């Protein structure tokens, strides 16, 4: 049996917040419950959004909360050659094409499709050529018919199915601004790190079918997925740096950890929050009972 390898992959666009903590805790608990390795990847591939010093601050905060990676952290910005190689392989296989559509053109086509009550997926305008337009991005061809349907079993959200042809369309691997798209980078990174289990927020559930299809195109294994409920703010929106989420305080980790455990549905008694060691032991046992090798039902 392949040894468990999981990861936590934050973007350094600001300090870690409570929503980040829920994802870090869930991924760490799953790795510990299964006796596996827990890795950290800094997803700084989106250069314009990266905040200088944020990655180092994140790593220090993780240490303050007791989350120590089992291997040195990996930075996406140091892995550009791997993304280029993957894109070259897909291009050689005839699976990728240049797209000259502007954001406005894509928005107009989606709006027209909505008015016709038809598909809202990218319509494949540039599949047959650029039609005199300059190349802006690179897209992966999505098959038609039954081959476009990707089904997987999520360990929290259960059975999932998505028709890539009708719900997504040919999707971007390299953006018009030259930045690598999340879908390509995360698939290549997970494959190279031999990740066997992905535990992350449910806001990324919609991306999973695309990633599974891309894994198949690149001949990579598909990890097991578990998507935890996202944390919402007072307005019912996902808690994020953009909505003003407060930074975590690594000097006082236990109250936030206890709240994160409650969000994950883990029932811990008061003694579990007496110390960081006590919390970790109790939380691992509670997670194991739900999602680990000793899960009940």
UniProtKB/Swiss-Prot annotation:
Cofactor(s) named in the record: Zn(2+)
ATP-binding is among the record's keywords: yes
A Gene Ontology BP annotation from the UniProt entry: glutamyl-tRNA aminoacylation
Highest rank taxon of the organism: Bacteria
Keywords for the protein's UniProt record, in alphabetical order: Aminoacyl-tRNA synthetase, ATP-binding, Ligase, Metal-binding, Nucleotide-binding, Zinc
UniProt cofactor note: Binds 1 zinc ion per subunit.
GO cellular component, one term: cytosol
This enzyme's EC code(s): 6.1.1.-
Binding site for L-glutamate: 7-11, 43, 182, 200
An example molecular function term from Gene Ontology annotations: zinc ion binding
UniProt-annotated binding residues for Zn(2+): 99, 101, 122, 126
Binding residues for ATP: 241
Motif mapping: 'KMSKS' region: 238-242
Placement of sequence motif 'HIGH' region: 10-20
Function noted in UniProt: Catalyzes the tRNA-independent activation of glutamate in presence of ATP and the subsequent transfer of glutamate onto a tRNA(Asp). Glutamate is transferred on the 2-amino-5-(4,5-dihydroxy-2-cyclopenten-1-yl) moiety of the queuosine in the wobble position of the QUC anticodon.
Family, per entry: Belongs to the class-I aminoacyl-tRNA synthetase family. GluQ subfamily.
Name of the protein in its database record: Glutamyl-Q tRNA(Asp) synthetase
């Amino acid at each position: 049996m392949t040894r468990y390898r999981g990861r936590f992959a934050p973007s350094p666009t600001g300090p870690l917040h409570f929503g980040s903590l829920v994802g870090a805790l869930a991924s760490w608990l799953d790795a510990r419950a299964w006796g596996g390795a827990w890795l950290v990847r800094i997803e700084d591939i989106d250069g314009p959004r990266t905040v200088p010093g944020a990655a180092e601050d994140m790593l220090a905060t993780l240490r303050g909360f007791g989350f120590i990676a089992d291997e040195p952290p990996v930075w996406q910005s140091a892995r550009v050659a791997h993304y280029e190689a993957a894109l070259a392989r897909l291009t050689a296989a005839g699976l990728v094409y240049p797209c000259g559509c502007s954001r406005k053109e894509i928005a107009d086509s989606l709006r027209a499709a909505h008015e016709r009550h038809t598909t809202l997926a990218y319509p494949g305008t540039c599949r047959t050529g650029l039609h005199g337009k300059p190349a802006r991005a690179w897209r992966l061809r999505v098959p038609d018919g039954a081959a476009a349907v990707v089904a997987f079993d999520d360990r929290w959200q259960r059975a999932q199915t998505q028709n890539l042809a009708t719900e997504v369309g040919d999707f971007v691997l390299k953006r018009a601004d030259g930045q690598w798209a999340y879908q390509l980078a995360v698939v290549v990174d997970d494959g190279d790190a031999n990740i066997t289990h992905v535990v992350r927020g449910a806001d990324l559930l919609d991306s999973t079918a695309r990633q599974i299809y891309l894994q198949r195109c690149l001949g990579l294994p598909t990890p097991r997925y578990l998507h935890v409920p996202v944390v919402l703010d007072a307005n019912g929106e996902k808690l994020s740096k953009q909505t003003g989420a407060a930074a975590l305080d690594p000097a006082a980790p236990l109250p936030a950890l206890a709240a994160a455990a409650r969000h994950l549905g883990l029932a811990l008694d008061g003694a579990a929050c007496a110390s960081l060691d006590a919390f970790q032991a109790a939380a691992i046992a509670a997670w194991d009972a739900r999602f680990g090798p000793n899960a009940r039902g």
